[in-house]
Amino acid sequence: TSGLGRNFRYPMFRLLSRFLSNDIAIDLGTANTLIFVRGKGIVLDEPSMVAIQSGAGNKSKIMAVGTEAKKMQGRAPRNIEIVRPMKDGVIADFVITERMLGMLIKKATEGRSLVPPRVVICVPGGSTQVERKAILDSAFAAGAASVHLIEEPMAAALGAGLPIEDAAGSMIVDIGGGTTEIGILSLGGMAYS
């Protein structure tokens, strides 16, 4: 295998990578994408939008992502299209989502990471295996060393400091830009979603 990202052969490199890489949590939403970096908090909260310039021979170029793409909405020339690659909390356009994620991760880490980041991404509770694989593949293609998925209600409960390990249930209502999820958590897992 190549690189310092996916599979280290030497324990020393694994240990070193923990100190050099960024641990990132991503809420990849229909309306906005938030990125949390360990030790820094939320470093990015931008619209899940991409400005794409059409080129000759079906070649396109990403002109802007996030806030910069939103600023172009309604003002861009005809050859630049503003798109939202996420629909109802899941990936609608894999290639554009991958490129958007890569650019937002680079922006959030200020392009300084020596080792690819370890990433946790929130996914809708009702997402299919195919949709989850698309998110995983997109994050790896964007340069992540490792990717873990967590259901949005579970992430919300952890963020709110709820006692998710207790036998008593905790109810979460996650109202997003494209979906609303309700989850009941008990004994460290989702009892209902």
PLM feature spans:
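Nucleotide/phosphate-binding catalytic cleft detector across ATP-hydrolyzing
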Residues: 2-177, 183-193
